[in-house]
């Protein structure tokens, strides 16, 4: 289970626990602009914003738990066991795997409005 909290004032603050019983080898990870992110069902994401967050490195691929991009947009992939639903690949849709979602959004969007459109 993960716990996240936000505090809204003139600024916006986000915090998150990483309360797992064991370690996944996560580490602070910086992905520079335009580092290639191969995607399973789309062309690789090769032009994108830089980001920093907590990730497990699977080879050269950062599996982000949470991150923020250079524009200040951040997101977290919280764990809710038993509640995830995964659809089959659909022609004509953006088919983004769960582990690709954080870099896919943060790489292309500067703010929440852009993420909603995407």
State each model region's role.
Residues 1-93:
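A contiguous strand-loop segment
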């Amino acid at each position: 289970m993960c716990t996240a909290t936000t505090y809204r004032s003139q600024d916006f603050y986000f915090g998150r626990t990483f309360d797992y019983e064991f370690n996944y080898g996560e580490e602070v990870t910086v992905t520079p602009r335009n580092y290639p992110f191969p995607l399973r069902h789309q062309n690789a994401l090769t032009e994108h914003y830089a980001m920093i967050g907590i990730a497990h490195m699977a080879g050269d691929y950062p599996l982000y738990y949470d991150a923020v991009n250079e524009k200040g947009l951040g997101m977290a992939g919280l764990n809710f066991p038993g509640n995830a639903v995964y659809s089959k690949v659909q022609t004509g849709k953006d088919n983004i795997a769960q582990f690709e979602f954080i870099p896919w959004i943060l790489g292309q969007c500067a703010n929440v409005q852009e993420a909603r459109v995407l």
